[in-house]
Amino acid sequence: MRENTPPRTPMDELIGDEEDDGLIYVGDADEVLDAWEQEGNIDEENDDDDENLFNALRTGRRVVKDDAKLTFDMHKGAVFCGALHPTEDLAVTGGEDDKAFVWNIRTGEVQFAVTNHTDSVIAVGFSYDGVFVATGDIAGYIQVFKVAQNYRKVWEFTAGDMCWMRWHIGSHVLLAGSDSGEVYVWRIPSGDCKVLPGHDAKAEAAELTQDGKKLAVGYGSGHFKLWDLKTNTPIIEVDPSIGHAVNITSLAGDQENQMFITGAEDGSSCIMGSNGLMGMLSAPNSEPIEAVLMDYPGFEIKVAATGTLHGKLTIWDVARQTKRVECSDEEPTGITKLLWLKDFTICAGTLGGIIKGWDFRSGLMRFALDGHSDDIQDIIYDKERNIILSTSEDWTAKIFEVPASQ
């Protein structure tokens, strides 16, 4: 691993540049010693308690109940990313240990291991039809393997320090954003490439439109661009003097490919449209926005959601640009990612390791899934199987079944 460099994590915005002189604080010293003493009295066969105590001492949180259907624990470091195969019982995960694994979501058995990355694997994914699986590390080394041919490598490339990587939603095209601001677009497996030029700022976040023809990109400078992937030109461009003045951390689009919501690390969130900036949902404040969503399919009005690193989840009326609901949470924990689920449910991965779900119409919490002992880095939803794949700083990935709506 090159200098053991992880990607930007949500906690970066909260802790800044403070150092702790190498000390790891896991709570009151007496409590830790008591835990060690208690562990010494536990029968050696109680493996589950051993693992829970190890996680508690390492991360400061002991899991009381694990709601997961399956836990994958082959990684030897934080697990940063994951993806689910569109039809097969397969997941792929990547982590700080410079490795990626393809594994069976029913048994946990490893199907394929990618061990030749030299830095943290921060992006993985299956192509839209499951034919290919891609892995990419923070240094920009990307590999693509053909699933049905015993994971034969069909393509590789080094693009320079990478921020994100994702597959196109309807073709064998792979996209990646770089620290230098360029966005690479490759045909797989031929490797034919075109580049969407940058401008001295990270291509921090990106989202394809529903028709797959355009790519919205948020940059570290606060710039927002909507690129036409066929002509290689920006259709919309909003510069920092009008929109965000700082790093855009997340963005999402609507079903009609006409509007986007953006969130930034200064707490601001904007609505972008065909003519540029349409309005600001939230002005800069002390709560960095880490995740956004827009336009729940089939709902009566167009809504958007913003999740902050302080744990606030807000549902917005897009047309009126007003707050509709603030979701209730008696123990708020920083939100790292948001997903729409079935039955008018919005789901959040959190810094506390809990996966939470709310009815976004009322803001009432529907479920809280426990199992992770440290921050959740990624969550992925499979609508057909109604399951969630989660990845965490606790070195594990887990499969959860979504609880039935009450």
What are these model-predicted stretches?
Residues M1-D66:
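Acidic, serine/threonine-rich intrinsically disordered low-complexity regions
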Residues K69-M74, C81, G94, V110-H117, ...:
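Short C-terminal beta-strands that terminate individual repeats in beta-propeller domains
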Residues G77-A83, D119-F126, G160-W167, A201-L208, ...:
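Canonical WD40 repeat/beta-propeller blade segments in eukaryotic WD-repeat proteins
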Residues P86-T87, Y128-D129, I169-G170, Q210-D211, ...:
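Residue-level detector of Asp-centered blade-edge/turn motifs that repeat once per structural unit
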Residues A91, V133, L174, L215, ...:
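Hydrophobic beta-strand positions that form the internal "hydrophobic ladder"
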Residues G94-D97, G136-A139, G177-S180, G218-S221, ...:
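Conserved strand-to-loop turn within each blade of WD40 beta-propeller repeats
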Residues A100-W103, I142-K146, V183-R187, F224-D228, ...:
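WD40-repeat beta-propellers
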Residues Q377-Q406:
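Blade-level signature of beta-propeller repeat domains, shared across WD40, Kelch, NHL, RCC1
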